């Protein structure tokens, strides 16, 4: 049985003070709750504060990105050992905004996935198609390429721990979410691809999230789907009550 996982991606929102305020309130709301796994991914600048506040809770800390090298002359980048030092358990890799604004390629994402596993971070690996690709019937082609190139060279013992977030690019931050059944079909496709690369057992262990304008009103539609194991939540995770309503749905 795959445990459900709800992750908050705060993107470029919240100062340290705002992070502290959110976590204190959210800790009160979620006290004693352990049914689903909860992950909070604040900006890099708030990771230290978040780590200190989450130490006495089952809530996991995640980062929104990382570089693939351990250290070096990479101005502005954050390494996996820096994330481990801050007690991060998860790291988001390949988010569509990174692909779009920072020209991240499947090859770069593959390097990041390998590095995350090397330093015992669990990747939340994002895949998803653009609207024009969906309109042209290319969803399967795009997802297949992203999954295959992203996972290239990774052993199955590592892949079975991964979380894959299906985030249709056209649904992110737009207020337009995919329908539950459509998201479930893509989740099935992802499992089929993993089964072809590795085996059925691995494909059944991988947890798949839906992301893209998830909110308290539509979360149940996604969690009711057989192949969807949680959500990667953007804007609706910025307020403690809203995020808590999603978690406990």
Swiss-Prot record:
Q: Which family does this protein fall into?
A: Belongs to the triosephosphate isomerase family.
**Protein encoded by which gene:** tpiA
Q: Tell where it localizes.
A: Cytoplasm
Q: Name one GO molecular function term.
A: triose-phosphate isomerase activity
Catalytic center at which residues?
Answer: 95 (electrophile), 167 (proton acceptor)
E.C. numbers:
5.3.1.1
Q: Which residue ranges traverse the bilayer?
A: none
Would you name any one GO CC term?
A: cytosol
Could you tell me which pathway this protein works in?
A: Carbohydrate biosynthesis; gluconeogenesis; Carbohydrate degradation; glycolysis; D-glyceraldehyde 3-phosphate from glycerone phosphate: step 1/1
Which source organism does the UniProt entry give? Answer: Dictyoglomus turgidum (strain DSM 6724 / Z-1310)
Q: How does it assemble?
A: Homodimer.
- UniProt keyword annotation of Repressor present: no
Reaction catalysed? D-glyceraldehyde 3-phosphate = dihydroxyacetone phosphate
Q: What does this protein do?
A: Involved in the gluconeogenesis. Catalyzes stereospecifically the conversion of dihydroxyacetone phosphate (DHAP) to D-glyceraldehyde-3-phosphate (G3P).
Q: Which UniProt keywords apply?
A: Cytoplasm, Gluconeogenesis, Glycolysis, Isomerase
Question: What is the protein name given in its UniProt record?
Answer: Triosephosphate isomerase
Upper lineage ranks? Answer: Bacteria, Pseudomonadati, Dictyoglomota, Dictyoglomia, Dictyoglomales
Q: Name one GO biological process term.
A: gluconeogenesis
Enzyme class, top EC level, equals isomerase
Q: Where is substrate annotated to bind?
A: 9-11, 173, 213, 234-235
């Amino acid at each position: 049985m795959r445990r459900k996982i709800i992750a908050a991606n705060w993107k470029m929102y919240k100062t340290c003070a705002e992070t502290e305020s959110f976590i204190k309130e959210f800790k009160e709301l979620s006290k004693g709750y352990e049914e689903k796994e909860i992950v909070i991914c604040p900006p890099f600048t708030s990771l230290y504060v978040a780590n200190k506040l989450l130490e006495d809770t089952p809530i996991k800390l995640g980062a929104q990105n990382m570089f693939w090298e351990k250290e070096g002359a990479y101005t502005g980048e954050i390494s996996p050992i820096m994330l481990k030092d801050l007690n991060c358990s998860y790291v988001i890799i390949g988010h569509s905004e990174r692909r779009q604004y920072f020209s991240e390629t499947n090859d770069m994402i593959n390097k990041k996935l390998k590095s995350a596993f090397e330093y015992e971070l669990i990747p939340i690996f994002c895949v998803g198609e653009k609207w024009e690709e969906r309109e042209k019937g290319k969803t399967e082609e795009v997802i297949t390429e992203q999954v295959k190139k992203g996972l290239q060279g990774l052993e199955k013992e590592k892949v079975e721990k991964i979380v894959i977030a299906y985030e249709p690019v056209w649904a992110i931050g737009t207020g337009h979410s995919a329908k539950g059944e459509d998201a479930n079909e893509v989740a099935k496709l992802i499992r089929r691809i993993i089964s072809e690369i590795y085996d059925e057992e691995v494909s059944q262990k991988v947890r798949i999230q839906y992301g893209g304008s998830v909110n308290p009103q539509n979360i149940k539609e996604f969690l009711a789907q057989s192949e969807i194991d949680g959500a990667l939540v953007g804007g609706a995770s910025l307020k403690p009550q809203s995020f808590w309503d999603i978690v406990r749905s």
